[in-house]
A protein has these predicted regions:
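Conserved alpha-helix/loop element of class I SAM-dependent methyltransferases that forms part
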Residues: 17-36
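A short SAM/SAH-binding and catalytic strip from SAM-dependent methyltransferases
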Residues: 101-114
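Class I SAM-dependent methyltransferase SAM/SAH-binding core
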Residues: 38, 44-92
C-alpha cells in the first residue's frame, strides 16, 4: 500500500510495467459492436489495422498512392480481409452515401484544404445514427508544422470544430481537449464528436 500511496496524484505520469495506451485501446475495442468504419487520411494504416481487429469493415482513405499501396500490402500480410484501402481525398471520399457507422479523422483534418467540406462528406457517407470522431491538434502557433509535417491548418479551436459539426447538421456536438504534450511546442489534442440524426 505504501508504494501506491506514494504514486497517488502522479499515477498517470509515472511508468508502470504493462500499462500502455495501446494495450488499453485493444481492450476498449473489444467492447465495440462490429461496425463499418471509415478512417480518413489513414496514412500507412496503423490505426486502421487496430480497428480492423473488431470492426465489421474498415475503409482506409488516403490521397497518397504509396501509402495506399503500402497499407494494402501490410493488411494482406496480416490477414485483414475486412480492411480495404482506397485512394481518394478526404474532402470527396470514394465511399457510398449512408454506408458507414463511424467516420474517423485522426490527425487528418488539418491536412484538408477545405476542412468544412471534409466534415460535410463525413455526414453524407454516415448512416443515420452514425458518429463522427475528429482527433486533431488544438489551435497553436507553431508555424513550422506547415513545412515539417505538411499541415495546412495550425490546428482548430473547440469553437471552430463545434461550429463545423453544427453547420452540417450533426446532433449533440461535443468538443474537449483530451491530451497535452509536456515538451515544446506543447501541442494539445482535441476530440470532437457528433451524431447524424435520423
Amino acid at each position: 500500500a505504501d508504494y501506491f500511496d506514494k504514486l497517488a496524484g502522479k499515477f498517470g505520469r509515472t511508468y508502470v510495467p504493462g500499462r500502455s495506451w495501446q494495450a488499453l485501446a485493444h481492450g476498449l475495442l473489444r467492447l465495440m459492436p462490429p461496425m463499418v468504419i471509415a478512417d480518413m487520411g489513414a496514412g500507412e494504416g496503423t490505426l486502421s489495422q487496430l480497428l480492423a481487429r473488431t470492426a465489421k469493415q474498415v475503409i482506409a482513405i488516403d490521397n497518397s498512392p504509396k501509402m495506399v499501396e503500402y497499407g494494402a500490402r501490410i493488411a494482406k500480410e496480416n490477414g485483414f480481409s475486412n480492411l480495404e484501402y482506397r485512394l481518394g481525398d478526404i474532402e470527396e471520399p470514394p465511399i457510398e452515401a449512408g454506408s458507414v457507422d463511424v467516420v474517423l479523422f485522426s490527425q487528418a483534418l488539418h491536412h484538408a484544404a477545405r476542412p468544412q467540406r471534409a466534415v460535410e462528406s463525413a455526414f453524407r457517407i454516415l448512416k443515420p445514427g452514425g458518429r463522427i470522431l475528429i482527433l486533431d491538434l488544438a489551435s497553436h502557433t507553431y508555424e513550422q508544422a506547415k513545412e515539417l509535417y505538411a499541415h495546412v491548418w495550425l490546428g482548430f479551436s473547440g469553437v471552430e470544430l463545434h461550429a463545423m459539426l453544427e453547420k452540417v447538421g450533426f446532433r449533440d456536438p461535443e468538443v474537449s481537449v483530451v491530451a497535452r504534450e509536456q515538451q515544446a511546442p506543447n501541442f494539445q489534442t482535441i476530440l470532437a464528436t457528433g451524431i447524424k440524426g435520423g
